[in-house]
Amino acid sequence: WKEGRPNKPGLLLIGPPGVGKTTVARAVAADMEWQVIELNASDARNAGAIRKAATHASTHGSLFMTPGTKPPRTLILLDEVDHLSGGLREISADRISSIVSGEDFDDSKALKGDSGGKAELLNLLADTRQPVILACNDEMGLWGRTSSTWRTARDRFSKHLITIRFERASNEALRRIALRVIKEEGFTADPGAIDELVNNNPGDLRALVRDLQVMCSLIDSNLTREMVKENIETGVRDTSVEIFPGLDLLYRSRTAQNAMKASRSLD
């Protein structure tokens, strides 16, 4: 994008949860000094919503450009695109335009869920003047796992996308990261404690960091294997923890009794 629009303007990041796909996308945007417009599974991602994101990305640069310079780029980031439902049937251009502009709004004609989202995403990739990154766990969800035309969908998307596959972090990498986090937080840890953390989060860097956040909120100086087992596996703790690490531990509890104990420790 430094030299202009490339032939394939989008990236498709594929990999299991917690390996850093979205983090890498945001880091690229930060390094390139791009703004970010993000749509994830919790947002409406129908044809109108995707068209709005594309329109906003195009106008944002022209609004904030310095005279005599090129307008800044805006990264359009769509996370969890394997959860984008529906086929490739397009919504009429007039209908999308009226939804985007807000003109003649009729709730009965509003697009529901992801209606027309995949087709509009293809249009976005074909016409975009801004970088696009898609992230997913399983590309077959995007192509249409249950559709007999999934190969056609794959080929149509692949014309506009460079695919990058992410792998789960190795145990050795997780150990190095855990030790670094513990050290930078001013604590020490027994080797058995680090092994227990790694074994509880096989290949999942995001989950490891969350567990480390919980552990660092509980220990005074040194982390032991027993402390990890007690708090990660059973959710029992003697002190309160902040709400978000505590909720994560609550959701990971394996029994109702342990979940109740974890909930009582929330700060």
Outline where the language-model segments fall:
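C-terminal alpha-helical interaction modules of replication/initiation AAA+ assemblies
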Residues: 133, 141, 148, 207-267
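Conserved AAA+ ATPase "SRH/arginine-finger" region at the nucleotide-binding site
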Residues: 40-42, 136-137, 144, 161-174
